[in-house]
């Protein structure tokens, strides 16, 4: 692979263009009028959107896709002439693409420059006044909130995030200003390539055991990223961030710390959260947000710190945060039918599950059941955090567990969803194992009752059953109306 990105007009071709990170890059490049194409085995609304702005999408990943670009002029040795070789596309891959992928191999044989997704993001970050959000948890919400805040303040940023946001109807937007807000992913170690003007680190924990063996390895990656940031903003509520990274600007939910930004008078309500924000000992004003829970208040405080670093008045910051509705699949309300509330959340790490269920408990009315439906994500993560997962469901009244979503990992026979269910059952009296999505759907139709808050958790495809369950609950209502 190379790491040099050509922005002179050379085409970009993405293998796996429908992925959340890949599609964001493809969208911004297409909107900047670069020729963009890509392949994906599972065309979806994201690939359809890319087609609508001029991207050419292939429904298969095969060598013939790159024949689309093969120049017609060859020299006598049947080699690509220099002037035509320069017109070959830059082929972009993510870590998910195997080196045995036929399209990937064809790109190498044809002589295309092959780049990792992170190389393109790093080049865009270098091309703008960039704000990059990193951390084990909270990246998507924090980066989306910062992007929305800057948009509402009239700064018209370019935004690339790891989730879809209703405000810009997708996971990316192209602005016309110098500002870029990006979510910076640590999962494969490529975080070290980014050198933004402002970097944010929300927290650091061990995750992605398919790539990291120890927390120390994760810390090394974040330390390298931190050194590349001209200004580093970090939450000192995370001891690792506080002690090992020593951010330039700090924030904390605890007013008795020496953080630059703190809060007091925190009030959690069913319709959101309010708090009084302090800047280096001086009260800035009241911050209101529609999102619940301590972790979202912490995310909002990071956004305040960014806004102030950019010179925004607190009033403009607070106005943007107050109207931010969140990203999709981040405690997203999917519907309310027959007195049952359906919420979709991307949580797939024990810490994320714990705080998400705590937020659900805050929102639940007295006597309302919190039903957690969880699809474990990756065998390696499930095995590594088996004990932690078992202790993460204390705020749920009922836990429904599916089999493990592999996310492309091989099943080595070391762990199953049923084993995880048994571990959770040691800590929780109401645990049910339903291995498949159809069996989950059938069980929920028999079990959910008016007043329940049904929370679907996981980074896999569990959320696909939500419309089916909602529709099924609607049918009896139609029949009796």
From Swiss-Prot:
Q: Which GO terms describe its biological process?
A: cell division; cell wall organization; peptidoglycan biosynthetic process; regulation of cell shape
Query: Per the record, what are the reactions this protein catalyses?
Result: UDP-N-acetyl-alpha-D-muramate + L-alanine + ATP = UDP-N-acetyl-alpha-D-muramoyl-L-alanine + ADP + phosphate + H(+)
The compartments listed are: Cytoplasm
What family name appears in the similarity comment?
Answer: Belongs to the MurCDEF family.
Task: Give the EC number(s) listed in the UniProt record.
Answer: 6.3.2.8
* UniProt pathway: Cell wall biogenesis; peptidoglycan biosynthesis
Q: What is this protein called?
A: UDP-N-acetylmuramate--L-alanine ligase
EC class name: ligase
**The keyword Mitochondrion is annotated on this UniProt entry:** no
Summary of the function given for this chain in its UniProt record? Cell wall formation.
Residues holding ATP = 135-141
Query: Where does this chain mainly localize?
Result: cytoplasm
Quote the InterPro entries the UniProt record gives.
Answer: Mur-like_cat_sf, Mur_ligase_C, Mur_ligase_C_dom_sf, Mur_ligase_cen, Mur_ligase_N, MurCDEF_pg_biosynth, UDP-N-AcMur_Ala_ligase_MurC
Is Cytoplasm included in the keywords of this UniProt record? yes
Q: Which key words are in the record?
A: ATP-binding, Cell cycle, Cell division, Cell shape, Cell wall biogenesis/degradation, Cytoplasm, Ligase, Nucleotide-binding, Peptidoglycan synthesis
| A GO-annotated cellular component | cytoplasm
Q: Name one Pfam family in it.
A: Mur_ligase_M
- GO molecular-function annotation terms? ATP binding; UDP-N-acetylmuramate-L-alanine ligase activity
Species assigned in the record? Nostoc punctiforme (strain ATCC 29133 / PCC 73102)
